[in-house]
Regions:
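Positively charged, aromatic-enriched nucleic acid-contacting surfaces
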Residues: 82
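Short, charged/polar connector segments at secondary-structure boundaries
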Residues: 1-78, 86-90
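Alpha-helical interaction elements
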Residues: 94-98
Length: 98
């Protein structure tokens, strides 16, 4: 499902307001370069919050996509109570594949 950028926000609001430290990391740079070359492949994992969607997995993809001017993002909506398990899976995937 594609959602306009303005309907998305990061679960960590301070990261969205001041992403400088996040953008200095190697992972962020890899994600930025990947999005430049091939676009968004993996969806953001989100929880519905009223008429908005909270990005719970995919901070780097979201920030890099915003930096590149993406107007919308592919997302998957999960129940709020499932988000911790999704984050565990995605973090273990990153350790193996990056």
């Amino acid at each position: 499902m594609k959602i306009p950028r303005e309907n998305l926000y990061l679960r960590n609001s301070s990261l969205e307001q001041n992403p400088g430290k996040q953008k200095q990391g190697n992972l962020y740079k890899k994600v930025l370069n990947s999005l430049k070359k091939i676009g968004q492949v993996n969806p953001l994992i989100c929880v519905k919050d009223g008429d908005k969607y909270k990005v719970c997995v995919g901070n780097n993809r979201f920030l890099a996509g915003c930096e590149l001017g993406f107007k919308e993002f592919d997302i998957v909506i999960v129940p709020d109570e499932s988000i911790d398990r999704f984050r565990e899976i995605m973090n273990s995937y990153k350790l193996v594949n990056l």
